[in-house]
Amino acid sequence: MNNRLKLHSIPALLLKPKSLSKMWVASAAFFTIAVLLVSFKTPSVKAGPQTDNDLNESKIQLGLAIAPVPLNFEHRNKRLVGLGSYIVNAQADCNGCHSRGPSTEYLGPGNPYLLSPPHGPFGGMQEVNIATYLGGGRDFGPFGSHSELLHLYSRNLTPDKTGRAAGGLTYEQFLTILRTGKDYDHIHPNCTGTPDGNCLLPPFNGDVLQVMPWPVQQHMSDNDIRAIYEYLSAIPCIDTNIAGAPVLRNNCN
């Protein structure tokens, strides 16, 4: 009798291990479902950098702000012009090569490469020389080893009277240049006889632009190249007149 009473006084769970296992499984399942429900209801938190749209918008606005020359937006996509300005002026330093060199790239005390008395090293605002901005004419010669040394000049990137960039190039031509380096002017062909100071000796290829970093630029996206073209179409025309480099002349009227 006492044994029966003691037996009945023991908790039922101790007498039913299978029931205990079922309760643990049920509890675990309930906890898992609760966690999943909470995770679905909890808003996701964005981490990392801005979205591509945010970054592009920032570049567009900055590009429009730093353009050193007045821009012509007529019949042009202003957003592409802004993005193109950012690439040309803040990333690629196109004017560093496509002007006449450091001595004329900037004006007076606005030249960061020169001392700016009485304050010593440059500490003020840069002032780009708009008279030479992207007008080409930087001499990368002498180039080659023959007696008549060749001088290579950076090309004029400003639009002509048609409003097309780089002296009247179509976008398709401009795209081809940046993708392949093709020289549409073909002003320095390969030498076929005695070097005359204008032709290129092997192994250099007279069909492509030398010095220009098109092997790097060819990896740019179509949209970025289009933006550069749009910007170069919006800047003022410059007629660069340098003896021995008629290719730099531009019909602005």
Where would I find each of the regions flagged by the language model?
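Bacterial N-terminal signal peptides
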Residues: 28-37
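Sequence/structural segment immediately N-terminal to covalent heme-attachment motifs in c-type
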Residues: 77-102, 107-117
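N-terminal secretory signal peptides that target proteins for export/translocation
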Residues: 1-20
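Electrostatic cytochrome c docking/interface patches
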Residues: 59-89
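Bacterial Sec-dependent signal peptides at the C-terminal "C-region" and cleavage site
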Residues: 38-47
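Electron-transfer interface patches adjacent to heme c in soluble/periplasmic c-type cytochromes
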Residues: 92, 113-177, 183-186, 214-225
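Detector for the c-type heme attachment site
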Residues: 97-103, 179, 213, 233-234
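Extended intrinsically disordered, low-complexity coil regions enriched in Ser, Thr, Gly, Ala
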Residues: 170-173, 183-207, 241-243, 248
